[in-house]
Amino acid sequence: MKRSLHLTFVCLSLFSARMCVQGNQFNIEVSRSNKLSLPGFENLTAGYNKFLRPNFGGEPVQIALTLDVASISSISESNMDYTATIYLRQRWTDQRLVFEGNKSFTLDARLVEFLWVPDTYIVESKKSFLHEVTVGNRLIRLFSNGTVLYALRITTTVACNMDLSKYPMDTQTCKLQLESWGYDGNDVEFSWLRGNDSVRGLENLRLAQYTIQQYFTSVTRSQQETGNYTRLVLQFELQRNVLYFILETYVPSTFLVVLSWVSFWISLDSVPARTCIGVTTVLSMTTLMIGSRTSLPNTNCFIKAIDVYLGICFSFVFGALLEYAVAHYSSLQQMAAKDRGKAKEVEEVNITNIINSSISSFKRKISFASIEISGDNVDYSDLTMKTSDKVKFVFRDKLGRIVDYFTIQNPSNVDRYSKLLFPLIFMLANVFYWAYYMYF
């Protein structure tokens, strides 16, 4: 019996001590230089219902926001999103938290659970989290007139629709939108505290591939099935730094095009040298094109500006290889034609000699009284040609002229014209390319 009473006494003592500790935690008093004692949190929130908004049933709560952008850690073209760390600060007035004096005091972040706070969320956010090191990165500050300051440190990944048709000379416009999840415009009204000056930190950011050109804030309305909501919008423009891509892709591809032109100054007879240059430049351009497309694996549905330029360079490199094939083939054809001409001349001389010898022999063996056969006065007027033979002769003559018209008479002129036309056309293509993608 005594043991039972002893255990009961110990339990009551421990419970009393526990209640005293909890009471001390909620009895918050802040002393200023003038020794003003602020009310305890427990007394201030007596009868407070955190499940009801301020002015419940009356005017909507006016919530003013400010935003500090600490960092933009990544911008993904493949996933079309960006990841940013922000400091979000919200201010509103809750008349239930008015106390005497003109001072303010900061509460432990864990006491936020006992107050009403807005259900603000980030529109189009894929994932977000509140920092918890070393404690939850939240701040709650009460002012004597009932104003509440609620600050959070959040890292969020937000969707950003990107148009990559001008990549890498593109400028992307991304948004950060804030809205109440459950309270519509009849309960909560959001606003920027100081307009564009409500957002800070963007002008100081240094990004790897982008430069922040400008940003501005706005307030819009979001009409949804559950009501009409106030939406705060931060819109900022990101201009890509093209210098990196010029050094990585544009300069090497241009050098490969120029390298392919070296073959124009090599003799047509140097088949291995010209073939090696042509094949090497084509393979190198193919590698560049594959590397460019694999760097953005999920954006291959876009025909990007860099793809257009690499396509132009590949056309010129492949064209230089085809130019040698045409010139070399024409050279072989010309040599074959010369050989055929010489053989034909020899054949004609042989035929003429045979005919002349045959006529001379015929003259000696046969003689006619009324006809004198002579090589000079033979009349061929009675020899006629059939109509079908005439048609074949005319057709062959026309076909031969057409073939001669498209046949390169001097293959060395192919290289001579290519030395001028290839660089000239490539320069014009560059002028149109850069003018279009930089200014249109």
From Swiss-Prot:
User: Which GO biological-process labels does this protein carry?
Assistant: chloride transmembrane transport
Q: How does it sit in the membrane?
A: Multi-pass membrane protein
The answer to keyword Ion transport applying to this record is yes
The entry annotates sugar attachment on N43, N102, N145, N196, N228
Give the keywords, sorted.
Cell membrane, Chloride, Chloride channel, Disulfide bond, Glycoprotein, Ion channel, Ion transport, Membrane, Signal, Transmembrane, Transmembrane helix, Transport
Q: Which reaction does it catalyse?
A: chloride(in) = chloride(out)
Q: Which domain of life is it from?
A: Eukaryota
Name the InterPro entries for this protein.
Answer: GABAA/Glycine_rcpt, GABAAp_rcpt, GABAAR_pi_TM, Neur_chan_lig-bd, Neur_chan_lig-bd_sf, Neur_channel, Neuro-gated_channel_TM_sf, Neuro_actylchol_rec
User: Which residues, if any, are the signal sequence?
Assistant: 1-23
Q: Which residues lie on this side of the membrane: Cytoplasmic?
A: 263-270, 323-419
Molecular function terms, GO-annotated: GABA-A receptor activity; GABA-gated chloride ion channel activity
* Record carries keyword Signal: yes
User: CDD domains under this entry?
Assistant: LGIC_ECD_GABAAR_pi (cd19004), LGIC_TM_GABAAR_pi (cd19058)
- Principal cellular location given in the protein's record: membrane
Which parts pass through the membrane?
Answer: 242-262, 271-290, 302-322, 420-440
Disulphide bridges: C160-C174
Q: What spans does the record annotate as topological domain Extracellular, numbered to this chain?
A: 24-241, 291-301
The record's listing under Pfam families reads: Neur_chan_LBD, Neur_chan_memb
Q: Name one GO cellular component term.
A: chloride channel complex
Q: Which NCBIfam families match?
A: LIC
The record, for PANTHER family, names: NEUROTRANSMITTER GATED ION CHANNEL (PTHR18945)
The UniProt function text for this chain reads:
Pi subunit of the heteropentameric ligand-gated chloride channel gated by gamma-aminobutyric acid (GABA). GABA-gated chloride channels, also named GABA(A) receptors (GABAAR), consist of five subunits arranged around a central pore and contain GABA active binding site(s) located at the alpha and beta subunit interfaces. When activated by GABA, GABAARs selectively allow the flow of chloride anions across the cell membrane down their electrochemical gradient. Pi-containing GABAARs are mostly located in peripheral tissues.
Quaternary organization:
Heteropentamer, formed by a combination of alpha (GABRA1-6), beta (GABRB1-3), gamma (GABRG1-3), delta (GABRD), epsilon (GABRE), rho (GABRR1-3), pi (GABRP) and theta (GABRQ) chains, each subunit exhibiting distinct physiological and pharmacological properties.
Q: Record's family?
A: Belongs to the ligand-gated ion channel (TC 1.A.9) family. Gamma-aminobutyric acid receptor (TC 1.A.9.5) subfamily. GABRP sub-subfamily.
- The name on file for this protein is Gamma-aminobutyric acid receptor subunit pi
List the source organism.
Answer: Bos taurus (Bovine)
Gene symbol of the encoding locus: GABRP
